[in-house]
From Swiss-Prot:
It comes from Dictyostelium discoideum (Social amoeba). The gene is ecmA. Keywords: Glycoprotein, Repeat, Secreted, Signal. Induction: Induced by the putative stalk-specific morphogen DIF (differentiation inducing factor). Its main location: secreted. It comes from the Eukaryota. Residues 1-22 form the signal peptide. This is Extracellular matrix protein A. The keyword Hydrolase does not apply. GO terms for biological process: culmination involved in sorocarp development; extracellular matrix organization; response to catechin; socially cooperative development. Pfam families: Dicty_CTDC. Cys-rich CT repeats lie at residues 43-70, 71-94, 95-117, 118-141, 142-165, 166-189, 190-213, 214-237, 238-261, 262-285, 286-309, 310-333, 334-357, 358-381, 382-405, 406-429, 430-453, 454-477, 478-501, 502-525, 526-549, 550-573, 574-597, 598-621, 622-645, 646-669, 670-693, 694-717, 718-741, 742-765, 766-789, 790-813, 814-837, 838-861, 862-885, 886-909, 910-933, 934-957, 958-981, 982-1005, 1006-1029, 1030-1053, 1054-1077, 1078-1101, 1102-1125, 1126-1149, 1150-1173, 1174-1197, 1198-1221, 1222-1245, 1246-1269, 1270-1293, 1294-1317, 1318-1341, 1342-1365, 1366-1389, 1390-1413, 1414-1437, 1438-1461, 1462-1485, 1486-1509, 1511-1534, 1558-1581, 1582-1606, 1608-1632, 1658-1682. It is found in: Secreted. The keyword Glycoprotein applies. GO terms for cellular component: extracellular matrix; extracellular region.
């Protein structure tokens, strides 16, 4: 048992030893030993050691080294001789096609590579023989390729060259048809070209020949309308041509014929108006002919009839002097005959009757001495007696009665001058009164009525101006009203109409500036809109188009910066694509090349994992392919051929059913193409024919809008054309016809306003014609009628002098006649008045020697008279007294029989009296009743004019009356009320100066009062007039202070005036300027409240505008922003509906999109997913039907790829390696051409470089030179277009030069010619606008001409035709009066005819009947006077009887009444000479009277009216001896004024009182005392100042009174300026911040402030003070807060609750 345990222990021990070192093999033997040498076993590959045993003793151990090479593919052993041995294991599988190996213990048999690096062999390995390299076949069964093989790249199927060098074919090749050469479509869809193609010239588009060989058409061709032949306009704008057109020669402008077959006109033609028929000048410059022209006779010069039907003239006419009517010489040189001439009977020499049957004259006549009547001398040298001589009674000296019973005269008699009835003067020198004198009551000065019953005048009358009717000032100083005044409505202020019917203006009106039409600001501040304004609708903000036709940009618009074409983000976040975008292709995501050149791997790339090379699964589960894989060619799935040779199908193969030929989707979603597909042409997208065969529409088609036919704009902005459009011919601009068919206008057309019919001028510059114009015939220059119906003038007219009326020569060479001529009586030769006012001479006259005065013989051979002669009265043959005391008889004495008492003739031949005679009253001539019951007229009657009713002059020139007149009350001169209700004045009125109130003397010896009288109590001591001539002071005077001048209160309590006062202008209340320069307020002013700026109402009642106002421009109605920032709504606004947000229509009628709209993303058309999770189908969608999953054909017909398809991956096309190591080629492989090494395009898109290529470095771009050595170009280079030799801008911005540049001369600026060869324009040139051909004005301001203009000759002022075809009018036209049709003078100067005129019969002269049914007349008719009912001769040759014929034809001879009721004559009658009324002599020898005689009272001596003196400061007086003299005017004044006369007015100039030496005294003047001195009063109204005056300067000084000084400067003493009392107050140191405690420092008077102490001595609180309440706030800190908050809290506590220190007191009440 013990042994067993021992053995077990040994085993365990040995196991422990062995296991201690696993890397060595240690063998312990039972050989005992003492040292290592005892244990050598002779094996050098072991370590021999002597070591202690496990339990007891020492034993030898042999440790074998380790031979493990850590290679599982070797058998490791150790040989005593050689050591470690590592024997490879046997891996050979006996297969030549594998390489056998062992790696880390794993045996592998790797298939060897049989790749011979020849792409033209199919490499494989045979299990028996090893590698095999068989040549491969490259035939692709494609007639379009040349098949070959390249050892490095493999099969090459190079596309054959299909180019037949014919530009007229499209060369192509297809698998089914082979090479084809299809003729190209040369049609450019332009009807204006002939499209063709030739091998030599290629495609040509030759312009068609549009010429129709017709010169009457403009031939053209338009892309839209094709060839058109538009008729040309042959109108040469010449009214003198007939315009037509000949197809062979073109326009024909044949001159028209203007011959009117009238010899009386000059026929011409005006280019602008047409035929012009100017009357010829028929004037032969001979005043002795009547020049005329008629159509039948032509021009005639008929001698005028010079006979004036006056036998007293010799009538003749000479070319030089014209018509003369020379008076015949009637003088027979015999003073004893009266030589006369009657126009009807001729010259007569009637013996004069020298017998005056007057015993008071001696009558005689001798050829030498003529007739003499020597008067008797009746003068007793007493002007107060009436000295007379009666042929019957002789000389009498009757005292005259000078009483005229009139209150208006002062009656007297002067022995020297006789009666003086001096009219009193009632003239009050007041134009506002009617000054009259009533014979019973005296002077009357009635105020005139100034009221003109017109509310639009201020009616007044002043002494200086008289009656004035001043128009009222209707101007309310408001330019927004039309101010007017009408008699009916008075003053009106009608608001102006500010609306200019233009929605583009803001219409407003300012009272100061008037109506304004401020253009509204349509700028919406958006760069994305074109802002404009429509006059009818207002602002239009049209969005601009930002489409740059670049698919690589997102086109948008920013309202601030404008169009933004942001490059799109092409990154699809897919590592498997190369992302790019070009303008031609748009965004492309080109797959990355994942090819690892191992065609048996699926080289792929996923968005998540990137590029992967997964071994291919050659099984495509597709019955349509043969699946295989070759390392060189890869997996092949050879498709079955499903090509049906139909380009209209997508040929594919269904995994389950076989070939699928799906019709292609030809819809390109473009409404502008007709999409189709045919077997011959394939898919075509033919542009739709948009032509609607309507030349009036612009036909177009856009992808968005489809076909549109937009009407063309026919407006050529020319008012002279009618713009229209014909669907067949297109737009036409037909010139409008401006011909008004009037020869009197020049017809033209203005492009801006349309027809202009300008009147022509017919002025022939001949004053002897009436120039007019007839709309049919043109100018008419009718000779004027020069006859002024005045026999005293010779009437003529010449071109140089015009119409002249030369006075006739009336001298008959007879000194005994006064030769005159009157319009009524013609030439008269009135016998001169031979009377020398000496009654004692016989006054006569000899035609040759003139008047003579021969002393008369006063013996009247009449026993009834005593004969004598008085120088004043002549012969005095004092009648015997035959008075029978019957006033109704003329008492006379018959030279032979004695007294004769003949009944008086009461008829005074005065239509103004009713004549009668009674014994009691005598002869009465009762004035007719002229009263028209209107007391405002002076009803009168004169012998000549009969009854008249003259409006009275109510002005009595009396300032003391109010003059007026009423129909009922007549003229009234109401005395003015002179009573001033002041008993202390003497009230009076002077007719010249007006009312005066003379004060009584109430002098109280007080220099400060004007002593006057109280109305009720007597004397009143009124303050003197202290007026310092300063309207700005209230002047007063008090006894203690003297005169004071207190400034006036200018305040008119009207807040609308600036109240001021100046010495010159006085108090003024200037209207304030209410304009606040703010167009947004209506500025006005109320007297009570002042200026107000009421905001104007800018509400335009349009919910679509934000109504605001701009201070400078006024109302601004800005369109509101209707954008709700929601792209899902169409935002708009209308006046009626306001803002609307209509949901957008998101339906794009596309079943392939999910249409939606969100506020964030806008409208989206999210394509629906048609993915069937089968990568082998083309998942598409038809817009009309929805998803289509068409099996794809993976045949890309690309020899460069191996095509496969899996449900998961889809088609796989592995690219071949095309690199030829040439940097000048793009190595590629094309499905049609195979691998190509296309020369790279080194075009850097920079036309400014010469691009080339280096095989080693690639493209080289060398800059080109663009210098063309031409000074007229700016040489530059444009990257896009290349050299740009841009003509320099030679424009000098002067449109008056032609700017050019030549290679030789450089830039030139040649002045242009603005001559338009049109005489009707003023040609000039404007730098800014160019030629200005301004039409000249042909207006001659003559209504008698049609003013026109001829392009060649200029202005044509053609006389208008004034003929109204009425023989009863004289038709004429004058510059001032225009056309007049004056009734013709039908008077044939034959008063024996009734002259008339009718339009039908013309002038007729019907004989009148002169039968007066009176047996006492011989009835006849005189052409000059008319009916003559000549009384039969009943004359008994007794001049003292009235011979009459009675109604029954019997004749009676009644004695005449010699009394002419004229006290100024001595009345007598001689049977031979008849009644005589010898004037009496009334001369009183007084130069201050005008001696005259009144028929009713006799002699009158009227005071002379002396003329106003030349010196207005003199007055006229009359001296009886000298007559009128001038004496200075007497002007009086008071003691303060110096009186003088200035310009006829007494003026008083204030005297200048001497200035006192003391400047604190002022000089003043007392009206009674004169100059006095008073002290200056200095009172500033402040009781706290001491007022004084500085005697040096005279200026007031106002020194503040001295306030008591306080030791405590915190006490302030103040003075009350009104009461003058002194009060003390303390400085207020209180603050608005109640945490500041203020105290006043007594030493300085200044406030010191300290912060209120709120420290509660608690470190755990933040101490502060509330400034509003003054209360302390002790807020515990928040100890949980962060450190920063704690610090800020502590700082806040320290700041807020600090103690002491000066607080911040920003606002103190002090």
């Amino acid at each position: 048992m013990k042994i067993s345990i021992f053995i077990l222990l040994l085993f365990i021990s040995s196991m422990v030893i062995i296991s201690v070192n696993a890397e060595t093999e240690t063998i312990q033997t039972n050989t005992a030993c003492d040292c290592d040498d005892d244990c050598d076993d002779g094996n050098r590959w072991s370590t021999d050691m002597c070591s202690a045993g496990l339990l007891f003793g020492k034993y030898c151990t042999h440790t074998q080294i380790c031979c493990d090479d850590e290679n599982a593919c070797t058998i490791d052993s150790c040989s005593k001789t050689s050591g470690c041995v590592h024997t490879p294991i046997n891996v050979d599988d006996k297969n030549p096609c594998t390489i056998d190996s062992c790696i880390k213990g794993f045996i592998s048999h790797t298939q060897i590579s049989c790749d011979d690096k020849n792409a033209c062999t199919i490499d494989s390995c045979d299990c028996s023989s090893g590698c095999q390299n068989k040549p491969m076949s490259c035939d692709d069964n494609n007639p379009c390729t040349v098949d070959s093989c390249n050892n490095s790249t493999g099969c090459r199927n190079t596309p054959i060259s299909v180019d037949d060098n014919n530009p007229c074919t499209i060369d192509s090749c297809s698998k089914s048809t082979g090479v084809v050469h299809i003729p190209i479509n040369v049609d450019d869809l332009n009807p204006c070209t002939i499209d063709a193609c030739t091998k030599e010239g290629g495609v040509t588009h030759t312009p068609v020949n549009v010429d129709d060989n017709n010169k009457c058409t403009t031939d053209s061709c338009s892309l839209f309308t094709g060839i058109t032949h538009t008729e040309i306009c042959c109108d040469d704008n010449n009214a003198c041509t007939d315009d037509s057109c000949s197809p062979s020669t073109g326009c024909v402008n044949t001159p028209i014929s203007c011959d009117d077959k009238n010899p009386c006109t000059v026929d011409s033609c005006n280019n602008s108006t047409g035929c012009c028929y100017t009357p010829i000048n028929v004037d032969d410059n001979n005043p002795c002919t009547i020049d005329a022209c008629t159509k039948s006779t032509g021009v005639t010069h008929t001698p005028i009839n010079v006979d004036d039907n006056n036998q007293c003239t010799t009538d003749s006419c000479t070319k030089e002097g014209g018509v003369t009517h020379t008076p015949v010489n009637t003088d027979d040189n015999n003073p004893c005959t009266v030589d006369s001439c009657s126009p009807f009977t001729g010259v007569s020499h009637t013996p004069i009757n020298v017998d005056d049957n007057n015993k008071c004259t001696i009558d005689a006549c001798t050829k030498e001495g003529g007739v003499t009547h020597t008067p008797v001398n009746t003068d007793d040298n007493n002007a107060c007696t009436l000295d007379s001589c009666s042929p019957l009674t002789g000389v009498t000296h009757t005292p005259i009665n000078c009483d005229d019973k009139k209150a208006c005269t002062v009656d007297s008699c002067s022995n020297s001058t006789g009666c003086v009835n001096t009219p009193i003067s009632c003239d009050d020198n007041n134009p506002c009164t009617v000054d009259t004198c009533d014979d019973s009551t005296g002077c009357c000065n009635t105020p005139i009525n100034v009221d003109d019953n017109n509310p639009c005048t201020v009616d007044a009358c002043t002494k200086s101006t008289g009656v004035t009717h001043t128009p009222v000032n209707v101007d309310d100083n408001n330019k927004c009203t039309i101010d007017a005044c009408t008699k009916e409505g008075g003053v009106t202020h009608t608001p102006v109409n500010t609306d200019d019917n233009n929605a583009c203006t803001l219409d407003n009106c300012s009272p100061l500036t008037g109506v304004t039409h401020t253009p509204i600001n349509c700028d919406d501040k958006k760069a994305c809109t074109v802002d404009s304004c429509s006059n009818s609708t207002g602002c239009v903000n049209t969005p601009i188009s930002c489409d740059d036709n670049n698919p690589c940009t997102v086109d948008s618009c920013d309202d601030i910066t404008g169009c933004c074409n942001t490059p799109i983000n092409v990154d699809d976040n897919n590592p498997c694509t190369v992302d790019a975008c070009t303008k031609s292709t748009g965004v492309t995501h080109t797959p990355v090349n994942v090819d690892d050149n191992n065609k048996c791997t699926i080289d792929a790339c996923t968005k998540e994992g990137g590029v992967t090379h997964t071994p291919v699964n050659t099984d495509d589960n597709n019955a349509c392919t043969l699946d295989s894989c070759s390392p060189s060619t890869g997996v092949s799935h050879t498709p079955i051929n499903c090509d049906d040779s139909n380009p209209c199908t997508v040929d594919s193969c269904s995994n389950s059913t076989g070939c699928v030929n799906t019709p292609v989707n030809v819809d390109d979603n473009n409404p502008c193409t007709v999409d189709a597909c045919t077997k011959s042409t394939g898919v075509t997208h033919t542009p739709v024919n948009v032509d609607d065969n309507n030349k009036c529409t612009i036909d177009a088609c856009t992808k968005e809008g489809g076909v549109t036919h937009t009407p063309v704009n026919t407006d050529d902005n020319n008012a002279c054309t009618i713009d229209s459009c014909s669907p067949s011919t297109g737009i036409s601009h037909t010139p409008i016809n401006c011909d008004d068919k009037k020869a009197c206008t020049v017809d033209s057309c203005s492009n801006s306003t349309g027809c202009v019919n300008t009147p022509i001028s017919c002025d022939d510059n001949n004053p002897c014609t009436v120039d007019s114009c007839d709309d049919l015939t043109g100018c008419c220059n009718t000779p004027i009628n020069v006859d002024d119906n005045n026999p005293c003038t010779i009437d003529a007219c010449t071109k140089s002098t015009g119409v002249t009326h030369t006075p006739v020569n009336v001298d008959d060479n007879n000194k005994c006649t006064i030769d005159t001529c009157t319009k009524e009586g013609g030439v008269t030769h009135t016998p001169v008045n031979t009377d020398d006012n000496n009654a004692c001479t016989l006054d006569s006259c000899s035609p040759s020697t003139g008047v003579s005065h021969t002393p008369i013989n006063c013996d009247d051979n009449n026993k009834c008279t005593v004969d004598s002669c008085s120088n004043s009265t002549g012969c005095v043959n004092t009648p015997i007294n035959c008075d029978d005391s019957n006033p109704c008889t003329v008492d006379s004495c018959n030279n032979s029989t004695g007294c004769v008492n003949t009944p008086v003739n009461v008829d005074d031949n005065n239509p103004c009296t009713v004549d009668a005679c009674t014994k009691s009253t005598g002869v009465t001539h009762t004035p007719v009743n002229v009263d028209d019951n209107n007391k405002c007229t002076i009803d009168a009657c004169t012998k000549e004019g009969g009854v008249t009713h003259t409006p009275v002059n109510t002005d009595d020139n009396n300032a003391c009356t109010i003059d007026a007149c009423t129909k009922e009350g007549g003229v009234t001169h109401t005395p003015v009320n002179t009573d001033d209700n002041n008993a202390c004045t003497l009230d009076s009125c002077s007719p010249s100066t007006g009312v005066s109130h003379t004060p009584i003397n109430c002098d109280d010896s007080n220099p400060c009062t004007v002593d006057s009288c109280s109305n009720s109590t007597g004397c009143c001591n009124t303050p003197i007039n202290v007026d310092d001539n300063n309207p700005c002071t209230v002047d007063s005077c008090t006894k203690p202070t003297g005169v004071t001048h207190t400034p006036v209160n200018v305040d008119d309590n009207n807040k609308c005036t600036i109240d001021a006062c100046t010495k010159e202008g006085g108090v003024t209340h200037t209207p304030v300027n209410t304009d606040d320069n703010n167009a947004c307020t209506l500025d006005s002013c109320s007297p009570s409240t002042g200026i107000s700026h009421a905001p104007i109402n800018c509400d335009d009642s349009n919910p679509c505008t934000i109504d605001s106002c701009n201070n400078s421009t006024g109302c601004c109605n800005t369109p509101i922003n209707v954008d709700d920032n929601n792209p899902c709504t169409v935002d708009s606004c209308t006046k009626s509906g306001g803002v609307t947000h209509t949901p957008v229509n998101v339906d794009d009628n596309n079943k392939c999109t999910t249409d939606a709209c969100t506020k964030e993303g806008g409208v989206t058309h999210t394509p629906i997913s048609c993915d069937d999770n089968n990568a082998c189908t083309i998942d598409s969608c038809s817009n009309s039907t929805g998803c289509v999953n068409t099996p794809i054909s993976c045949d890309d017909r690309n020899p460069c790829t191996v095509d496969t398809c899996t449900k998961e991956k889809g088609c796989q096309h592995s690219p071949i390696d095309t690199d030829d190591s040439n940097k000048c080629t793009i190595d590629a492989c094309s499905s049609t051409t195979g691998v190509t090494h296309t020369s790279i395009n080194c075009d850097d898109n920079n036309a400014c470089t010469f691009d080339s290529c280096s095989n080693s470095t690639g493209c080289v771009s060398t800059p080109i030179s663009c210098d063309d050595k031409n000074p007229c170009t700016l040489d530059s280079c444009d990257k896009k277009t290349g050299c740009c030799n841009t003509p320099i801008n030679v424009d000098d911005n002067d449109k008056c030069t032609t700017d050019s540049c030549t290679k030789e001369g450089g830039v030139t600026h040649t002045p242009i010619s603005c001559d338009d060869n049109n005489a009707c324009t003023t040609d000039s040139c404007s730098k800014s606008t160019g030629c200005v051909n301004k039409p000249i004005s042909c207006d001659d301001s003559n209504p008698c001409t049609v003013d026109s203009c001829s392009n060649s000759t200029g202005c044509c002022n053609t006389p208008i035709n004034v003929d109204d075809n009425n023989p009863c009018t004289t038709d004429s036209c004058t510059k001032s009066g225009g056309v007049t049709h004056t009734p013709v003078n039908v008077d044939d100067n034959n008063k024996c005819t009734t002259d008339s005129c009718t339009k039908e019969g013309g002038i007729t002269h019907t004989p009148i009947s002169c039968d007066d049914n009176n047996p006492c007349t011989l009835d006849s008719c005189s052409p000059t006077t008319g009916c003559v009912n000549k009384p039969m001769n009943v004359d008994d040759n007794d001049a003292c009887t009235t011979d009459t014929c009675n109604k029954d034809g019997t004749i009676t001879h009644t004695p005449i009444n010699t009394d002419d009721n004229n006290k100024c004559t001595l009345d007598a009658c001689s049977p031979k000479t008849g009644v005589t009324h010898t004037p009496i002599n009334c001369d009183d020898g007084n130069k201050c009277t005008i001696n005259s005689c009144s028929p009713s009272v006799g002699c009158i001596s009227t005071p002379v009216s002396c003329p106003k003196p030349k010196d207005k400061c003199s007055i006229s007086q009359c001296d009886s001896a000298k007559g009128c003299i001038e004496v200075p005017m007497n002007c009086t004044s008071d003691k303060c004024n110096e009186a003088s006369c200035c310009d006829g007015v007494c003026t008083s100039k204030p005297i200048s009182c001497p200035k006192p030496k003391n400047k604190c005294q002022v000089a003043k003047c007392d009206l009674i005392k004169g100059c006095t001195v008073s002290n200056v009063v200095c009172d500033d109204g402040n009781a706290c100042t001491e007022d004084s005056c500085c005697s040096d300067t005279g200026k007031c000084q106002f020194e503040p009174i001295k306030l008591p000084k306080n030791k405590n400067k915190c006490i302030i003493s103040k003075c009350d300026p009104i009461k003058g009392t002194i009060t003390n107050s303390t400085v207020n140191c209180e603050c608005d911040d109640l945490c500041n405690i203020g105290e006043c420092c007594e030493d300085t008077g200044k406030c010191n402030y300290r912060q209120k102490d709120c420290d509660d001595n608690n470190p755990k609180t933040a101490d502060s003070c509330d400034s509003k309440t003054g209360k302390c706030i002790n807020k515990p800190y928040n100890v949980i807060t962060s450190g920063s908050n704690l610090i800020s809290g502590l700082i806040g506590g320290l700041i807020g609750g600090g103690t002491g220190g000066k607080g911040d007191c920003k606002t103190c009440k002090n």
